[in-house]
Amino acid sequence: MRGRPAGWSPTGSRFGILQDARQGAGRDRRRHGGAREGGVTARYVATPQALAEVAGALRREPRLGVDTEAASFHRYRDRIYLVQVSGRTETALIDPLAIADLGPLGALLADPQIEKVFHDADYDLRVLDRDYGFRAARLFDTRIAAQLAGEAAIGLAAVVEKYVGVKLDKEHQKADWSRRPLPPPMLAYAAADTQHLLALRDALEQRLEGLGRLAWANEEFKQLESLRWTGAPAGGASDDESYLRLKGAKGLTPRSLAALRLLHRWRDSVAEREDKAPFRIIGNDALLGVSRALPASPAELGHVRELPPSLARRHGAALLDAVARAKQLPDAQLPRLERRPRPIKDPGFDGRLENLKAARNRIAVELGLDPGVLCGRSSLEAVARARPTNREALKQIPELRPWQIDVLGDAFLEAGSGP
């Protein structure tokens, strides 16, 4: 979620945003107009010297609000294009395209003396690990806190409006953060993502303390510290089996699957060459439609309902070539969806799982929590498989947190005691 303060105006404000006059390549800097929110100033950091200076100032803060901006909606290569870090009185908008060494930022994130506040930290932490190898210590996630507080709407805008009284908009939610220079409205918008996190954190902490759930949240926050990137390296191509995960692929014949595989590879190569998000080359529905129809001529291609005429004209030759090559493949080389064997369940598994789910749902209603927040399905299945008979056995189930055992333990032992 991306937001900016309501009522922001780029003219006549006292908010100073520093930006390199040459978009990060030169030495001279100039100030752009921006916004000032609640006494917090923000500046655009585009040189190693500026980063060292602002990191030194932020190192004196007890806690920092942190967020990142990417451009996966626009670019093939998913990477971080902006990092926002807010203290009590200053926000740094750090440009990783302009600064080769972000070591001072990594040191801030790793400092256990400084609490780092994110909203929905999972992806931010993973991409910070992927792009820079950064690890973050001592975390507070306002999204998790809102979930454990029983909030139904947990987006940043919703919880900031409820707990801080500031209305954020979504104007630049899908903006292209790879563009340079970033205009002042986008910079002010990005700054708002972190400028309200500290106040939101304090309000949610107070709420969780009142509910007796702060310890639950702290357990969840500690788990975040171990998050690492597990996908392809930054800028890496998608894996060769990713076409099988497209919605609708499982319903295709082997011959159509072969066409989809070749079409998907073609789209990926074009997207990489042009550094555009793959869907901006051609959408998934169009790929599936062509694969299903297996057209042999421009006329037949034009009858594919999912393919816009403009894309048929632009990419028709490449699409027909991929289909023709798929038709020429011998049957032995056609892809086939392998059915994964279903795990063998003992006869009483389904009954125990339903009993556990009913117990979980009952307690979730009593606590005013979403059942999935209280205990997810994978954790329920782990308990059903383990068939614990006491709390010590519950503690041996890695999917369960200690706070969940405290809250659900007795009910789980009773519900899972069947055959």
Residue ranges and their predicted role:
Residues 16, 22, 26, 31-64, ...:
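N-terminal accessory regions of nucleic-acid-interacting proteins
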Residues 3-4, 15, 19, 25, ...:
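Accessory DNA-binding and partner-docking regions appended to nucleic-acid-acting proteins
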Residues 65, 74, 82-85:
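Non-catalytic, usually N-terminal nucleic-acid engagement modules in DNA/RNA processing proteins
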